[in-house]
């Protein structure tokens, strides 16, 4: 019995892919790449959406996750600029998604606070 328990514990844990990874749109693919820690692909996908410049919630979410991607890759000044942009576009989103905290993290990491 002990052997069976030890053998079961020793098995590798296989996580299910994130639920967004089945999406066929640009945002879903970029978000899947972000969740899988493929930050180069995520950045390219989110940047493409942001550069389209559509005034919709998906673009706002793409700006947010582009900022998060920049933070994950150590580009804190770029992330701070994006977070400030979110503040200018939609203060309610900025507050709800706790962008002020993230901006503070960027400033601390950049040595500005």
Question: Which stretches of residues belong to each language-model region?
Answer:
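Short solvent-exposed coil/turn linkers within tandem alpha-helical repeat scaffolds
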Residues: 19-20, 50-59, 86-98
């Amino acid at each position: 019995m002990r052997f069976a328990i030890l053998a079961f514990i020793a098995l590798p844990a296989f996580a299910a892919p994130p639920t967004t990874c089945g999406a066929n749109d640009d945002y879903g693919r970029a978000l899947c790449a972000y969740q899988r820690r493929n930050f180069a692909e995520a950045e390219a996908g989110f940047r493409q959406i942001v550069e389209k410049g559509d005034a919709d919630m998906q673009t706002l979410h793409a700006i947010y996750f582009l900022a998060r991607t920049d933070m994950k890759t150590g580009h804190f000044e770029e992330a701070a600029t994006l977070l400030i942009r979110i503040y200018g576009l939609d203060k309610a989103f900025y507050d709800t998604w706790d962008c002020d905290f993230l901006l503070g993290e960027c400033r601390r990491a950049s040595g500005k606070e």
